[in-house]
Amino acid sequence: MRLSRYFLPVLKETPAEAQIVSHRLMLRAGMIKQASAGIYSWLPLGYKVLRRIEEIVHEEQQRAGHIPMLMPTLQSADLWRESGRYDDYGQEMLRITDRHGRDMLYGPTNEELITDIFRSNVGSYKDLPLTLYHIQWKFRDEVRPRFGVMRGREFLMKDGYNFDLTKEAALHAYNRHLVSYLRSYERMGLQAIPMRADGGPIGGDYTHEFLVLAETGESEVFYDAEITDLSFGDRQIDYDDVGQCQAVLEEFTSRYARTDETHDPDAFAKVPEARRRSARGIEVGQIFYFGTKYSDAMGATVIDKDQNQVPVHMGSHGIGVSRLLGAIIEASHDDKGIIWPEGVTPFHCGIVNLKQGDAAADAACEGLYDALTKAGLEPLYDDRNERAGGKFATMDLIGLPWRITVGPRGLKAGVVELTSRKTGESEELSPEAAVAKVVARYAGA
């Protein structure tokens, strides 16, 4: 993409309403624009990152054997009355009446709807196990939306639902989700720690939240510092292997890590004092096992091998897709702007022409642009007739992992400058070597 033809409305000044780093930088980098309180339009740069995150989530869910689908944003209130949650959910749920006087709601979650789909179409234990998921916009009428996409009223979320014949099978589904979430977050450049949490309005007595440690986090968390040394890495997982998935769960949850709702001071005191930590965390996902809560209430049953009609065991599993953008920025930025991890960057590399209109510089930039594009990457070429300082400031603000700078002086020596946004280190390379190094960084991604 050529910046002269792109829509990137960057701001020089920080809007007064932005209270935290991610909100400030998303507004300044032209990623979002507020439409109303807690509701945002996603401008091209922000939308590209959103799609990158969606792609990772889809890939990892399907790697785990989960089946994608799509449910509507509007739901019938009758289903929620059936489960008993219509009145329990409170004012966060936006209630709507259509022209025929039917009560509807803008779904804050989908347990009732997916249970209705299941009970209408599945009747035998032979159809189990089954895990369905979707990525859809949701709405919760927050009293005081703030912090940009971190606590908005409208947000994009992946939620998945497993249906199993037994508790043991449902807990294996729980473990599969934990593994797939760990893989997803690491691909996004995040360390998200699974912590024992409270079930809230969704319910269930077994649940983990995934939290990214950050000073701006809304949750207070308590944990054993050893857990921050864990990494999923590039290990291979057989999602059908019960023991292997259970081992990952035990590895990542055996140390003390809890949110404030479930914090146990006596248990925490058993952690060696030097390893005890308290901090703030940003919730970016949560997994639940809630047994037969919804299947009992809504009649989601199957015939087992002994011809008995039994309720299915269920779980619900969510990732805050739009919130992840804010969490990534909170975890990866400096005083100049965003520092995108390579897995979610909107463009793979920036190209800065220091002297637009110079024949040699223009030709070299076009050559770099073509070479990167042919290699399957998406470069952003700043071909505007602007001063160099302004071009550098824009590139630093939007945070692309790599920048190739081209100028007449360097070209006379046969080199361009390749700069890492993360480290700030630069090196002079031939144009061909610069392209090769950038391409190698994304090989296999």
Swiss-Prot record:
State the UniProt keywords alphabetically: Aminoacyl-tRNA synthetase, ATP-binding, Cytoplasm, Ligase, Nucleotide-binding, Protein biosynthesis
Annotated GO biological processes are: prolyl-tRNA aminoacylation
User: What is the enzyme's class at the highest EC level?
Assistant: ligase
**Lineage: superkingdom:** Bacteria
Q: Name one GO cellular component term.
A: cytosol
Reactions it catalyzes: tRNA(Pro) + L-proline + ATP = L-prolyl-tRNA(Pro) + AMP + diphosphate
Q: What is its main location?
A: cytoplasm
List the subcellular locations: Cytoplasm
Which molecular function terms from Gene Ontology are attached?
ATP binding; proline-tRNA ligase activity
Q: Which SUPFAM superfamilies match?
A: Class II aaRS ABD-related (SSF52954), Class II aaRS and biotin synthetases (SSF55681)
Q: Which Pfam families match?
A: HGTP_anticodon (PF03129), tRNA-synt_2b (PF00587)
> What is this enzyme's EC?
6.1.1.15
User: Would you identify the family this protein belongs to, as annotated?
Assistant: Belongs to the class-II aminoacyl-tRNA synthetase family. ProS type 2 subfamily.
Function, as annotated, reads: Catalyzes the attachment of proline to tRNA(Pro) in a two-step reaction: proline is first activated by ATP to form Pro-AMP and then transferred to the acceptor end of tRNA(Pro).
How this chain assembles, per its entry, is: Homodimer.
**NCBIfam families tied to this protein:** PRK12325.1 (NF008979)
Write down what this protein is called. Proline--tRNA ligase
Native organism is: Dinoroseobacter shibae (strain DSM 16493 / NCIMB 14021 / DFL 12)
Taxonomic lineage of the native organism: Bacteria, Pseudomonadati, Pseudomonadota, Alphaproteobacteria, Rhodobacterales
Instruction: List the gene name.
Output: proS
